């Protein structure tokens, strides 16, 4: 995950003796906010991920803004950032910065997994000459299952943006660095 823009921006704020809260919203590798906080102890840095889909960011911000995660060790920073977000988020959650960073990855890879699962079922249905659309539309009648990320067609398959492949690759590399024997994230990339 390339964090150079975030690091450069925070370095500039530090050089200019910035005194406010720095809320990082860009997806960064888990541990980045903690590292930057240690590097710039005079800045109050927190991680506040956005959960916007590329194709409908405005609608997500206004209508589907159901969660605001604030990654900070400071109660005061949490309070101020929460207040700054006003009434849009339905839920607020204070976590450690690294936990908040991981929530963002979990969200995106969860969505990538749904795409992979849907494309696989689409292929099975196509081979069996049955309607994926009818099956999917029946499934989403269950209250806990959303229609998001379940659309499939012959013209375009796999990821439809830059965030999901980028974040899945970043977690696959993190798993490698941690010497974990988990192929799941690489499988998602291979399938998309």
Predicted regions and their residues:
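ATP-dependent carboxylate/acyl-activation modules
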Residues: 173-177, 184-192
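Internal alpha-helical scaffold of NAD(P)-dependent oxidoreductase catalytic cores
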Residues: 35-48, 53-148, 174-181
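Rossmann-like NAD(P)(H) cofactor-binding subdomain of soluble oxidoreductases
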Residues: 1-56
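Residues that form or flank phosphate/diphosphate-binding pockets in enzymes
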Residues: 31, 79, 166
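A short glycine/serine-rich beta->alpha loop
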Residues: 155-159
